[in-house]
């Protein structure tokens, strides 16, 4: 199955979501098996309907998109994703320069909507085709399919990278160059797991460690210098 990146039209309209706490990208995965299950059940084939009903329920859980209250803290960098911190390491980013990379692993049970780590202007959203290796393998940040979103904040630059994995083969990015983001605002998602990396300037007071659980748009992962 080939990977694919989806983009919105840019601006607020491109980032519009459904009113229900479910990401709009999830409805086909929820409604189609639900309709099949209903049809089978109505025709008396209830046992055959069960797998489709289960698939619909699982998709409803996967594509959940709860409302979040983002803290208003000066110079704070919010987690761009739900998950577990798998790496905190010095790195060099083409946009940020000398940086600290905070890598977050998203399991299939996590919320998979990505959120802006800080308020600022999207300078670019750069997609790169690549492999679909497991998210925990070293070096996948440079070899896997990914989309890097470069954000110019009030005082610093930050890069967020959506990285596809073995099961996650569709990156959804709803922003483009020139869009403005607020801290904690939704900007995309990675379907069915994988990893989100956040590059912050070196010297940032990193507030998380490997193994910590983080919540997108809520957990402060660092304070800018």
Placement of each model-derived feature along the sequence:
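Contiguous, well-folded functional domains in the mature portion of proteins
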Residues: 2-225
């Amino acid at each position: 199955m080939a990977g694919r990146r989806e983009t919105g039209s840019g601006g607020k309209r491109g980032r519009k979501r459904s009113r229900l706490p479910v990401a709009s990208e999830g409805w086909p995965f929820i409604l189609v098996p639900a309709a099949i299950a209903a049809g089978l059940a109505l025709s008396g084939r209830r046992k055959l309907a069960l797998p489709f009903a289960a698939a619909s329920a699982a998709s409803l859980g996967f594509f959940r998109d709860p409302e979040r209250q983002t803290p208003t803290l000066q110079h704070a960098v919010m987690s761009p994703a739900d998950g577990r911190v798998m790496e905190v390491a010095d790195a060099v980013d083409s946009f940020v320069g000398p940086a600290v990379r905070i890598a977050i692993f998203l399991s299939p049970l996590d919320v998979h909507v990505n959120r802006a780590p800080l308020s600022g202007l999207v300078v670019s959203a750069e997609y790169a085709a690549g492999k679909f290796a497991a998210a925990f393998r070293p070096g996948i940040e440079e070899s896997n399919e990914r989309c890097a979103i470069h954000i110019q904040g009030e005082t610093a630059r930050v890069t967020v990278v959506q990285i596809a994995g073995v099961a996650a083969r569709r990156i959804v990015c709803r922003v483009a160059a020139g869009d403005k983001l607020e801290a904690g605002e939704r900007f995309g998602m990675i379907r069915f797991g994988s990893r989100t990396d956040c590059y912050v300037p070196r010297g940032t007071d990193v507030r998380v460690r490997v193994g910590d659980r983080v919540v997108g748009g809520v957990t402060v992962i660092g304070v800018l210098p």
